């Protein structure tokens, strides 16, 4: 009888823990959703647009940072609308040097007034992300998979902001995003789309 009671307690605790984990990523106060849209394959990887949406109802982000761990030995060849904070060791490359060879890169937004040829839509706001707004950047990833079967989602994703701590769930492969051209006469779709959901944890 005592053994049965102990088993029931353990099951209740596990269920409660799962409930907390589920609720944490479906907060009534909204969340930060980060979407990776893979747009083109390259000889050694892909080009993607990464967009962060602030679905929080009342919390503004004063300056975001994103980081993740590559599941292969990926490098970031170049970026538009954002930059990595460190290049890392790229000594194995000759001639064309990647922007970052760091296994877990950290990315920050560019400043307003960035030259137009370094921008994309919804970038360059110093990382400020107001409720209901979005921020985006483009990156070219190399030494990565270049097909639906071989491209790998980022792991250990982190979204940070000054005096704000967030908890991010795992990357998920979702239905590819559809895009409408400016003249509204053509619809295209991403090759693949990955989603990461992050929720506010506490002020720091």
UniProtKB/Swiss-Prot annotation:
Belongs to the COBRA family. The lineage of its organism: Eukaryota, Viridiplantae, Streptophyta, Embryophyta, Tracheophyta. This is COBRA-like protein 5. Expressed in roots, stems, leaves, flowers and siliques. GO terms for biological process: cellulose microfibril organization; response to oomycetes. One of its GO terms (cellular component) is membrane. COBL5 appears to be a truncated member of the COBRA family due to an in-frame mutation that introduces a stop codon. This truncated gene is actively transcribed. Glycans are attached at residues 31, 195. InterPro entries: COBRA_pln. Keywords: Glycoprotein, Signal. Residues 1-24 form the signal peptide. PANTHER family: COBRA-LIKE PROTEIN 5, PROTEIN COBRA. Disulfide bonds: none annotated. Pfam families: COBRA.
């Amino acid at each position: 009888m005592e053994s049965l009671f102990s088993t029931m307690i353990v099951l209740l605790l596990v269920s409660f823990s799962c409930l907390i984990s589920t609720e944490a990523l479906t907060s009534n106060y909204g969340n930060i959703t980060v979407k990776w849209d893979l747009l083109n394959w390259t000889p050694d990887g892909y080009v993607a647009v990464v967009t962060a949406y602030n679905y929080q109802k009342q919390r503004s982000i004063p300056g975001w940072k994103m980081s993740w761990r590559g599941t292969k030995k990926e490098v970031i060849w170049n970026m538009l609308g954002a930059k990595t904070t460190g290049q890392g060791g790229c000594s194995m490359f000759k001639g064309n040097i990647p922007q970052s060879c760091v296994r877990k890169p950290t990315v920050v937004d560019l400043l307003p007034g960035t030259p137009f040829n370094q921008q994309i839509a919804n970038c360059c706001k110093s990382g400020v992300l107001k409720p209901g707004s979005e921020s985006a950047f483009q990156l070219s990833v190399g030494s990565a998979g270049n097909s639906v079967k071989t491209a790998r989602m980022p792991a250990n994703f982190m979204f940070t902001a000054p005096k704000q701590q967030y908890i991010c769930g795992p990357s998920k492969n979702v239905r590819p995003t559809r895009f409408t051209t400016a003249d509204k006469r053509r619809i295209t779709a991403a090759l693949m789309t990955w989603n990461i959901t992050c929720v506010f944890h506490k002020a720091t």
